[in-house]
UniProtKB/Swiss-Prot annotation:
Catalytic activity: sulfate + ATP + H(+) = adenosine 5'-phosphosulfate + diphosphate
Region (G1): 34-41
Organism, scientific name: Escherichia coli O157:H7
Residue span of region G2: 92-96
Chain positions covered by the region annotation G3: 113-116
Protein name: Sulfate adenylyltransferase subunit 1
Keyword Protease appears in the UniProt entry: no
SS bond partners: none
Amino acid sequence: MNTALAQQIANEGGVEAWMIAQQHKSLLRFLTCGSVDDGKSTLIGRLLHDTRQIYEDQLSSLHNDSKRHGTQGEKLDLALLVDGLQAEREQGITIDVAYRYFSTEKRKFIIADTPGHEQYTRNMATGASTCELAILLIDARKGVLDQTRRHSFISTLLGIKHLVVAINKMDLVDYSEETFTRIREDYLTFAGQLPGNLDIRFVPLSALEGDNVASQSESMPWYSGPTLLEVLETVEIQRVVDAQPMRFPVQYVNRPNLDFRGYAGTLASGRVEVGQRVKVLPSGVESNVARIVTFDGDREEAFAGEAITLVLTDEIDISRGDLLLAADEALPAVQSASVDVVWMAEQPLSPGQSYDIKIAGKKTRSRVDGIRYQVDINNLTQREVENLPLNGIGLVDLTFDEPLVLDRYQQNPVTGGLIFIDRLSNVTVGAGMVHEPVSQATAAPSEFSAFELELNALVRRHFPHWGARDLLGEK
């Protein structure tokens, strides 16, 4: 057993007390990214090692692996703790997104070690999509590179507001304060182009030697700020979804018997309470919350992130993909939107193509109306293109086969994030973040039911020669 873990259990008074204490710790999800060979995997290995998260058999195995695959001579190659794929170990690079878990006395952590190579941008975007903080590694010898800018842009595009710029390999520049200051100023100049109000912090460190990772460095007396671990333990993550209006996407209609009909899902944002008046979209029908059912029994209220089942006072038509929100909120359904897209398929995204999309449990079909621009993620300039290639990022106009209820991704990632699915292979080929839902004059919600709208779309798609009118007034 890990000796540090054994000591923690003893201090808490037993396994059960320790597990209860773990449940009450806050959780921080973060990713490490940067240019190739900046030391991302080594940094994670150092965090695991210095927080005593490595079991004795793992440490013994690491000694053996360091002799066979290591790049640090007689020293432990801590990157081998993370680089699990054989291809990664042989090349000394990270290809897949590797997840690791550790905890300290103050917090629990989930780390995503993402690839640095440009051809693995899609892997990096996947890792960033669930994270709240990004550690951007910069080699002190090289300074701010194009890949550093690219990873910064992708992180902020996916809603990450907290950036920790870790200037690594300070031991190779003699722990120079001048080098640290120059890189810090260069990055801040670039960061002015990034969107949103960002919390940016800088830490000079050496992942290989352990300077300023989990303990203060004696080699950099000029730096009086916190270590990287202290930043991770103390950074305040404001959960945007808590303050947002109620959004409850229905994942499953739960009807175990004739006496119970509930709507199961995870509350995406806001809060809901018994007796609250709610509205179902896109139908627009209203009802009251009769019960909030959870695994631990009935509740009077529920908050964002909790998996619940809602029971309403009225028997109304609700199906998977419908959205429940407060009755007094006006949120129109739209049939088109501009979407920031990260393309993940070999076949480029082109105007005129159709894909299935999935958003908050709702699956429908979409058409690519046009590509406004592709972002050159090395310098953040925009250029006109005819199609969006593999790993390309751009702003795309989409039209949907049926009305959807959308939020901007920066406001609500659950109801603003979508994936593209190839209709033939059923493979996920892209990720989208709603930039702006495009409002248009649509039929009143009560005029047509969801079934009538779907049937109308089906007839127009498969039997165009019938000349059926679009109930929503579109061409």
